């Protein structure tokens, strides 16, 4: 009699490649062989990459969702775009979030009411609540990373207003000690809350603007820089060049990780909505960076201030941008949109539905879609297990 353990390894790998990310825990418990293959096979990553399928996680309607995006038909004359498969994660269905971040197979969820953080390992099905040293704020910036010993940490950047000058505070949460530590950092940069950063190889990167003091008043210089936070040293590295210059104009910028190997940056000046520019790194580490052009398009849609997360397909030469539709004062609702832009002014859009109005008469009134990972790789990092619906102290 043939059992599940008798199936050929290549057949098991094919089966595992078709299993949703959030169901792998149940599959692993079927037999020892399947458990071992699921760890080494990494969710059929090779197969999905060959088929132009992007697997990951995102935030939609204040909920954590798994995402599968198939770009196989893009740029083909007879090809049709398969709409993204977005499914709410049932394990976290009691949790409303305002931001999501990803690093090393872990997902960091910022709770919507700003009362706590939740770290989730989708592969192991484990969660860990993290409690604040003091109150979280709506404009806090976060990053997830790890040091040279693979010890995971969280960076929090928050605003202090002791005077009319804008001042930032910095603190780091250490998973191994279950504690926060305030950093002695004298900020020389302004990291806007709507500037979306990204984690790469354990370090966190942020777009920023250098500060200068004129007549005792701090103002924003016109120099745009990329900052790297080194989780081993728990310090920022030197300011690195970005592949654009805003000339002190208002602009939007967002970072994305490319296959855990490169960074991509999306840039748009608010006075020139018809143009979007995307560049990717040729080389990057905490002290150096070089860039190359990936895409410049004039398809003409303004990226929403608090949205604009994206990923790129290097083979198809397209970018997939998650956004809100353009605001119109006469409309009573807005829609969550996926824009697909490419060379030669290629443009498609997918309507993902009405964006919930979560804060009437607020500058963040509508719930934006945010993608935090498009090339998810499972992690064996152990978290203390606690139920998402109950906030217990972590040991």
Curated annotation (Swiss-Prot):
Pfam families: F-box (PF00646), FBA_1 (PF07734). SMART domains: FBOX (SM00256). Residues 1-47 form the F-box domain. Gene3D superfamilies: 1.20.1280.50. It comes from the Eukaryota. Kelch repeats lie at residues 154-202, 210-256, 265-314, 337-383. The keyword Cell inner membrane does not apply. PROSITE patterns: FBOX. The keyword Repeat applies. Keywords: Kelch repeat, Repeat. InterPro entries: F-box-assoc_dom_typ1 (IPR006527), F-box-assoc_interact_dom (IPR017451), F-box-like_dom_sf (IPR036047), F-box_dom (IPR001810), Gal_Oxase/kelch_b-propeller (IPR011043), SCF_F-box_component (IPR050796). NCBIfam families: F_box_assoc_1 (TIGR01640). PANTHER family: BNACNNG10540D PROTEIN, F-BOX PROTEIN CPR30-LIKE. This is F-box/kelch-repeat protein At3g13680. It comes from Arabidopsis thaliana (Mouse-ear cress).
